[in-house]
A protein has these predicted regions:
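Bacterial Sec-dependent N-terminal signal peptides
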Residues: 2-8, 17-56, 336
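A structural detector for beta-sheet-dominated domains
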Residues: 58, 86, 130-132, 157, ...
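Ser/Thr/Pro-rich, low-complexity mucin-like regions
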Residues: 143-184, 298-323, 334-335
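Surface-exposed beta-loop interaction hotspot
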Residues: 172-218
Length: 336
């Protein structure tokens, strides 16, 4: 009787090894192959503001990350952070018996339906978060380029999930991007509000009772020279300790009528609290970071038109920069 020959052992071993490496989520033992897959590639990352949970939903599946807010995992600061998965830094996958919504994870009291049918808890590995700045398109009129948001690219490395039927390990699992909004910087200055401190060395522009201020310390003496009329006078920002340009956004409003008390003090007062501070990058001759002042007569006095040209601001704490614009009028200063 003719019998079907058995498959050679080397071929069987190669086949088994190939099957064991097909998918990301699988477990393989001596003779059984279990294939399980989860896919959140097309899902958008969202956050629960109450519990600092970042999550993705795909139909009846949910994948969440919970890192204490005190650890500042999604800080608007360019750079890389790594968190070890443990009882504080959690990654959890859940399957439900029906389509899931944010209410199932973000509500103080989750709805009774849908219910959890499967849950995997990560018990080892790390969470890597790489943060970069995302910029707006250049303003058609001014050329200004602002930071619109910060993007946090999240990856799990060597993560182990504990499942009901054993552990599942990923060498690399890309969670995806989670975006946070950048702090809005109004940069809304009335040219007529610019003032010069009595020292003659500090220019500032701020609305009385406003929440922001722009100032230049150690102003070059030639810029306001009233003997040079109709000709643009220029100087470079933040060069040789001159023309130190700074923008401040405050947590609380400036005192009404108190702008000179604040901006002309040395050092500047601690109140109101500074929410964000940005400094002008050092200028490059004929290229960037330029202060330009043109002086003309104004009755018995003078009018100084003050422009900032091709200025980039930087925030060392956040590692970020933004472009203020090609040619911005920051003030028209009147003098006698």
């Amino acid at each position: 009787m003719y019998s079907i020959p058995s498959t050679p052992q080397p071929i069987m071993k190669k086949l088994l090894l190939s099957l064991c490496s097909i998918a990301l989520l699988n477990s393989c033992d001596d003779g059984d192959l279990t294939l399980e897959t989860i896919n959140f590639d097309s899902a958008t990352a969202q956050e629960c503001s109450l519990n600092n949970v970042v999550y993705k939903i795909n139909g009846n599946q949910l994948l969440l990350i919970e890192i204490p807010a005190t650890s500042l995992p999604y800080e608007n600061k360019i750079g890389d952070k790594t968190f070890t998965i443990n009882s504080n830094n959690k990654v959890i996958y859940r399957g439900y018996n029906n389509t899931v919504s944010s209410a199932s994870i973000c509500s103080t009291i989750p709805p009774a339906s849908p219910s959890v049918t499967e849950e995997w808890n990560a018990i080892a590995g790390t969470i890597s978060i790489q943060t970069t700045a995302i910029y707006s398109a250049a303003n058609a009129l001014t050329g200004a380029i602002k930071i619109s948001k910060y993007r946090h690219a999240i990856t799990f490395n060597n993560i182990t999930f504990a499942k009901s039927n054993g552990n599942q390990v990923y060498e690399t699992f890309v969670f995806g991007d989670y975006d946070t909004n950048a702090t809005a910087l109004p940069m809304n200055f009335n040219p007529d509000s610019i003032q010069l401190c009595s020292s003659g060395q500090t220019l500032y522009n701020a609305q009385s009772g406003g929440i922001e201020g722009l100032y230049i310390q150690n102003l070059s003496s030639n810029l306001l020279d009233s003997t040079v009329l109709g000709i643009a006078k220029t100087a470079l920002i933040n060069t040789n300790n001159e023309n130190l340009l700074t923008y401040r956004l405050f947590s609380l409003a400036l005192t009404l009528g108190g702008n000179s008390t604040y901006f002309c003090a040395s050092p500047l007062p601690d109140s109101p609290l500074v929410k964000e501070e940005w400094t002008g990058q050092a200028g490059v001759s004929n290229t960037s970071g330029i202060i330009e002042v043109t002086t003309t007569t104004n009755g018995s006095g003078y009018s100084h038109s003050i422009h900032l040209k091709s200025v980039t601001f930087s925030n060392p704490l956040a590692g970020s920069t933004f472009y203020y614009g090609d040619d911005i009028l920051i003030g028209t200063l009147l003098s006698n």
